[in-house]
UniProtKB/Swiss-Prot annotation:
It comes from the Bacteria. Keywords: Autocatalytic cleavage, DNA damage, DNA repair, DNA replication, DNA-binding, Hydrolase, Repressor, SOS response, Transcription, Transcription regulation. Belongs to the peptidase S24 family. Represses a number of genes involved in the response to DNA damage (SOS response), including recA and lexA. Binds to the 16 bp palindromic sequence 5'-CTGTATATATATACAG-3'. In the presence of single-stranded DNA, RecA interacts with LexA causing an autocatalytic cleavage which disrupts the DNA-binding part of LexA, leading to derepression of the SOS regulon and eventually DNA repair. Homodimer. Its EC number is 3.4.21.88. This is LexA repressor. It catalyses: Hydrolysis of Ala-|-Gly bond in repressor LexA. NCBIfam families: lexA (TIGR00498). The keyword Glycoprotein does not apply. Residues 28-48 bind DNA. The active site is at 119 (for autocatalytic cleavage activity), 156 (for autocatalytic cleavage activity).
Length: 202
């Protein structure tokens, strides 16, 4: 990485802090306002300079299309609460990055998902655990998957037959989720490949 000027470092720090506090990068207008630039165009020029130096990536066509490359390379992205209808790996869902070797899991983990609820506790996936996920749609019946039904994301064991998908919990207190593929949007976000235990259970 090339050294940043003082002003570029200010812009970079603002982006990083804004993501940490709000879960999403700032707009050009917000950068201009916070740092006293005359216009969003001035902020854009600084963003382009940061992109040339390899510390951010500018995603075209989005007002908040800024991605911190340094942090992406520094561990697996940790996905927290997922907003309805938005991509799982959208920047605003990334709580941070976790220092773990993706190669510890087979196949390799692409991201971590913070587990909410106890529907899979009988196979050791507890509330608050970090689920290691391999991003793929190539899954088989009987595997534990991260699935999206319409706007909701869930972790369950997959059973598919014809136009019907059953998402099976591993806890007798929960009922299977039955999905009619003719009536609902359904997709697989990834395959569960491991768990990092929440220390509160130890």
């Amino acid at each position: 990485m090339k050294a940043l000027t003082t002003r570029q470092q200010e812009v970079f720090d603002l982006i990083r802090d804004h993501i940490s506090q709000t879960g999403m990068p700032p707009t050009r207008a917000e950068i201009a306002q916070r740092l006293g630039f005359r216009s969003p165009n001035a902020a854009e020029e600084h963003l382009k300079a940061l992109a040339r130096k390899g510390v951010i990536e500018i995603v075209s066509g989005a007002s908040r299309g800024i991605r911190l490359l340094q942090e992406e390379e520094n561990g697996l992205p940790l996905i927290g609460r997922v907003a309805a209808g938005e991509p799982l790996l959208a920047q605003q869902h990334i709580e941070g990055h976790y220092q773990v070797d993706p190669g510890l899991f087979k196949p390799n983990a692409d991201f971590l998902l913070r587990v909410s609820g106890m529907s899979m506790k009988d196979i050791g996936i507890m509330d608050g655990d970090l689920l290691a996920v391999h991003k793929t749609q190539d899954v088989r019946n009987g595997q534990v998957v991260v699935a999206r039904i319409d706007d909701e994301v869930t972790v369950k064991r997959l059973k598919k037959q014809g136009n019907t998908v059953e998402l099976l919990p591993e806890n007798s207190e929960f009922k299977p989720i039955v999905v009619d593929l003719r009536e609902h949007n359904f997709s697989i976000e990834g395959l569960a490949v491991g768990v990092i235990r929440n220390g509160e259970w130890l």
